[in-house]
């Protein structure tokens, strides 16, 4: 899954208005889904299932807030159900978000809804764009805020076999514009064949836009990624390395995806 934008200035104006309506409520980045949206969505009438999993063998050992999931040794994941409504719109449901701590047991973390608007046929465009709106309902150990949301613009360029994609994300905890959190993700990929690609991805969290965190308190993680697109299932796997003290030192991610009809 990933994003493309609807066609024409009328849709663009509607998306901008929707984004502005969301801004008065700020957020924090999620850790169940480690992915750069690339402008591609399910075809109209198609139901797609994507399984997101990430495991942190060497992560932060202190909770982000009292009672929070401690990242070290935890497996986080979620099934994502996506339905292609039309060539420029995909609706999604993430259910259930879950964590499996190193000590064992299963923790349910909540669920998410999303609306992804994109430029149709993004895979065939030299420049593509889109906008994702996400609404999260969180368990107390997953996020201190019971409701959060995400505003994810999508900008991408295809340069021959290379791709450059930027998602300048604003996480929103519904506490006002000044509390919006800037957590961009970036991907530079190279398509070895129509089925195989390699990429470098960076996931960052600078903190709230009213005042970014000090550099050593920010989160910056660099992933080496391999993608396979084809039958019977699409696969994305990667290894991430923390670049700052406030980042998990080592994270493994696996994303499996296929159409169900």
Where are the regions a protein language model picked out?
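Bacterial N-terminal signal peptides that target proteins for export
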Residues: 1-15
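Low-complexity, intrinsically disordered regions enriched in charged/polar residues
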Residues: 16-17, 30
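Hydrophobic alpha-helical transmembrane segments of integral membrane proteins
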Residues: 20-21
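N-terminal signal peptide c-region/cleavage motif recognized by signal peptidases
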Residues: 24-26
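Transmembrane beta-barrel domains of Gram-negative outer membranes and organellar outer membranes
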Residues: 28-261
């Amino acid at each position: 899954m990933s994003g493309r934008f609807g066609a024409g200035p009328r849709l663009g104006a509607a998306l901008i208005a929707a984004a502005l309506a969301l801004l008065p409520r700020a957020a924090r980045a999620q850790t169940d889904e480690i992915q750069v949206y690339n402008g591609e969505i399910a075809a109209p009438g198609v139901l797609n299932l994507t399984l997101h999993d990430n495991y942190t063998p060497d992560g932060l050992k202190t909770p982000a807030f009292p009672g929070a999931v401690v990242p070290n040794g935890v497996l986080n994941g979620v099934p994502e159900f996506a339905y292609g409504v039309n060539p420029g719109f995909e609706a999604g449901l993430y259910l259930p978000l879950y964590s499996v701590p190193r000590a064992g047991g299963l923790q349910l973390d909540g669920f998410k809804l999303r609306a992804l608007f994109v430029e149709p046929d993004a895979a065939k465009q030299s420049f593509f764009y889109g906008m994702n709106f996400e609404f999260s309902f969180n368990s107390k150990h997953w996020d201190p805020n019971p409701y959060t949301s995400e505003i994810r613009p999508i900008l991408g360029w295809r340069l021959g076999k290379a791709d450059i994609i930027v998602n300048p994300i604003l996480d929103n905890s519904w506490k006002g514009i000044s509390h919006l959190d800037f957590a961009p993700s970036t991907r530079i990929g190279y398509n070895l064949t129509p089925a195989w690609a390699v990429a470098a991805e960076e996931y960052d969290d600078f903190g709230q836009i009213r005042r970014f965190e000090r550099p050593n308190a920010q989160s910056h993680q660099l992933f080496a990624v391999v993608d396979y697109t084809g039958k019977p299932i699409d696969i994305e796997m990667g290894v991430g390395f923390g670049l700052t003290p406030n980042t998990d030192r080592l994270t493994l991610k696996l994303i499996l995806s296929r159409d169900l009809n």
